[in-house]
Regions:
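Bacterial Sec-dependent N-terminal signal peptides
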Residues: 1-20
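Carbohydrate-active catalytic/glycan-binding domains of CAZyme proteins
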Residues: 19-535
Length: 535
């Protein structure tokens, strides 16, 4: 029986301190070494800062909310999600702005506060800050309004002056591969100078982007990728002035390894005097996973990995921590707040869903007027895929008050496939709904797999519902998702056709739940999620 909130309130300190260990991927080998990726999930454009023995990471979230995930580690290998810095981004938008929003954030610790800067390619440069990264962050401040500015990184100099470097999005302003620097006010809230072009990648280092700004040994350093997400390399640039001129050097590239395009990331100097670099690798439908590389400064340049090529297995950074912990995946929905691993496909509205006193998460069927497919549905409850191979199982109850209300388990990207139950007349159909080119407006196809009698029904006259209790399962391997169901949670039957997963716009495919109402005259149906488990 599910615990009630009264009991949960007493247990919150225990729940908060519980540390999740994944069943499908852990980078810590338990012998003082780690194996990349250290985060085998889609944390695109990661950046990191260190405060004492604590490391904090954030990444791009684009239009998914809550945004700007905050992860914590004590050793750069074992990470857990501790919060989000952005709760709302487009409050006036109902349709998701796929691929827009938060691009390539930068997290810094300055004068007792944590700052995150990011570029929204359509709106400008934004900043949020807090004194407690596990708590509430301030409302976003627009530092510079305008289009095209992306991949921002601040630097507070020794004299207290603040500078900002950023890249530019060709899709918004007509050019890219250049980096510009300007001065901000000392508090970092507004620009006080115009931009100066400090680097042009041209033909040699085309698609230069994602800069991070540092200072070391009297040099101003910019570390950034070039050459594109899937096949690029990592540059380091240095100058005696923040405005250049900068000399550059390639410090990390694929070389003879299988690690394609070691891309954007952040450098960190630990309290033990070690240097490390976190970056992402693009894995297609699985998104942009996070790798950790040692950094060697002996040549005066930050040569990453082993002689400039990525390492796969290596010794762990020095640390007093021996705890193994991973980003959260499974969820029993026993807490009065939604788990930190979940995001909505757009800005959250309360009528999408909420926790309940019965220890289930309740989604309300979303009234979807567009009949072609689910691409523009903001109310999907999704999380990142946690490994190349995994099994996701959900225990669900659908209370359908009218025909055409359905809910179930989905793999979502530019194309999608879902296993759902839909009310048809006085019974339920098990269906596989698939759309391979949802982003192009392709019409969804529907395959009826089974028909069930309701497991329960309301004994009232006013808008009575019929109920379906079911376990839905998705097996993922090799970029394909296959489905199964069970009525007792023990014996599962494979159904439907394997689905070739597709990535989203700038993000990997996501797994989760969907609840839809195509009957606009009825009360909303209810999809109660008892639990969701990754194995």
């Amino acid at each position: 029986m599910k615990r009630l909130f009264a009991s949960l309130a007493l247990m919150l300190p225990l729940v908060a301190s519980a540390q999740y260990v994944s069943k499908v991927w852990s980078p810590d080998n338990g012998d003082g070494t780690y194996t990349n990726p250290v985060i085998n999930a889609d944390y695109s454009d990661p950046d990191v800062c260190v405060v004492g023995e604590d490391y904090y990471l954030t990444s791009s979230s684009f239009a998914h909310m809550p945004g700007l995930p905050i992860l914590h580690s004590r050793d750069l290998v074992n990470w857990e999600i501790i919060g989000h810095a952005l709760q709302s981004q487009f409050p006036d938008k109902e349709v998701p702005e796929h691929g827009n929003g938060v691009w390539a954030p930068c997290i810094r610790y300055h004068n007792g506060e944590f700052y995150i800067y990011w570029g929204d390619p359509d709106r400008g440069v934004y900043m949020v800050k807090t004194k407690d990264p596990r708590g509430t962050w301030d409302e976003p401040v627009c530092v510079i309004a305008g289009k095209g500015m992306i991949d921002t990184s601040p630097l507070w100099d020794d004299d207290g002056r603040c500078y900002l470097v950023n890249g530019w999005a060709n899709s918004r302003c007509g050019f890219n591969s250049v980096l510009t620097v300007r001065e901000l006010s000392a508090d970092g809230t507004k620009a006080i100078s115009n931009p100066v072009l400090v680097f042009d990648g041209g033909n040699k280092d085309y698609t230069t982007e994602g800069p991070k700004f540092y200072k070391r040994d009297g040099y101003y350093w910019i570390m950034c990728p070039a050459g594109g997400v899937e096949q690029g390399w990592q540059l380091a640039m240095r100058s005696k002035s923040p405005y250049g001129p900068y000399e550059s050097k390639t410090v990390l590239a694929q070389g003879k390894t299988k690690v394609n395009g070691p891309h954007q990331g952040g450098w960190v100097h630990t309290q033990y005097g070690e240097d490390w670099f976190l970056h992402f690798q693009d894995k297609g439908v699985y998104g942009r996973v996070v790798w950790l590389q040692p950094v060697d400064w002996s040549s005066g340049w930050p040569i990453m990995g082993k002689k400039g090529e990525p390492v796969t297995t290596y010794r762990k950074p020095k640390s007093t921590s021996t705890t193994i912990v991973n980003p959260q995946e499974s969820d029993e929905f026993n807490a009065p707040k939604l788990g930190l691993q979940w995001q909505w496909q757009g800005d959250y509205k309360q009528y999408y869903g909420m926790p309940t006193a019965n220890g289930v998460f309740r989604m309300f069927t979303y009234r979807h007027s567009a009949v072609k497919n689910l691409w523009d549905v903001p109310s999907m409850l999704l999380q990142k895929t946690p490994a190349d191979k995994f099994c996701a199982t959900a225990k669900l109850r659908l209370a359908a008050k009218a025909e055409n209300q359905f809910g179930g388990l989905i793999m979502m990207g530019r194309g999608y496939s879902c296993l759902v139950v839909e009310r048809v007349g006085d019974s339920f159909q098990l269906q596989q709904r698939t759309c391979n080119k949802a982003d192009k407006g392709e019409k969804e196809t529907k395959q009826v797999l089974a028909t069930f009698k309701p497991t329960d029904r309301d004994k009232i006259d006013y808008h009575p519902a019929i109920y379906m209790d079911i376990y839905l399962r998705m097996n993922v391997e090799g970029g394909k998702a296959s489905f199964a169901y069970s009525l007792n949670g023990k014996s599962f039957k494979s159904v439907g056709n394997p689905f070739t997963m597709r990535e989203g716009k700038w993000v990997g495919a996501k797994v989760g739940m969907v609840a839809i109402d195509n009957n606009t005259k009825s009360d909303a149906g209810l999809l109660d999620i008892d639990w969701f488990r990754i194995d």
